[in-house]
Regions:
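Substrate-gating cap/lid region and adjacent catalytic-acid/histidine neighborhood
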Residues: 1-109
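Alpha/beta-hydrolase-fold serine-hydrolase catalytic core, especially in secreted/extracellular enzymes
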Residues: 34, 46, 57-67, 75-78, ...
Length: 173
């Protein structure tokens, strides 16, 4: 949470030898709102590249089901934001159980509003294969060409893939 610029560079040098400067450039371009040095260490490069790969492969299947990509960007206010948007944070929102998990979500009004949106998207997707509903911006199916991605946050937005260069750098593909 309180990592210095120097400790972040040391971590990145060990994790991505010879790629630190490009990593920082691409990460800041993809995530300009990340202000703390530690934010640059917390970018998901463990699960995200695989998710993008799967979305690209599955969306290319002729006659296959549409693919809907999302990122859960909402930041937990608990412990002065220590949790940020940890892996699996969206589960309580998808099942609309944020009050039961208030120790992680804070159980705020804003969190409840987002939980209602995320839950309905999951329900719609389970019922129809399409997560769209009137509480969200139009969410096009993902393709490798449009890279349409829903960003779940207090204000939900659809954007193209912002971290493509970073993923290519990290994976070497």
């Amino acid at each position: 949470l309180n990592a210095s610029n120097e400790s972040v560079r040391t971590y990145l040098d060990k994790t991505y030898p010879g790629k630190t400067d490009k990593y920082l450039e691409y990460a800041k371009k993809a995530w300009p709102t990340h202000k703390r040095p530690s934010d640059l260490m917390d970018i998901d490069m463990r699960f995200r590249p695989g998710a993008v790969y799967q979305a690209n492969v599955k969306s290319a299947v002729t006659g296959g089901a549409p693919v809907y990509m999302y990122l859960f960007d909402w930041q937990s206010p608990v412990l002065d934001g220590k949790y940020k948007s940890v892996h699996c944070m969206e589960i309580a929102f998808a099942f609309n159980t944020i009050q039961r998990t208030h120790n992680m979500t804070g159980g705020t009004k804003e969190a409840q509003k987002l939980a209602d949106k995320v839950n309905l998207a999951w329900v719609n997707f389970a019922k129809t294969g399409n997560p769209n509903h009137k509480g969200l911006p139009k969410w096009p199916a993902y393709t490798e060409q449009n890279t349409s991605t829903m960003h779940f946050d207090n204000v939900c937005t659809v954007k193209p893939q912002l971290d493509k260069e970073l993923i290519e750098l990290v994976t070497g593909q």
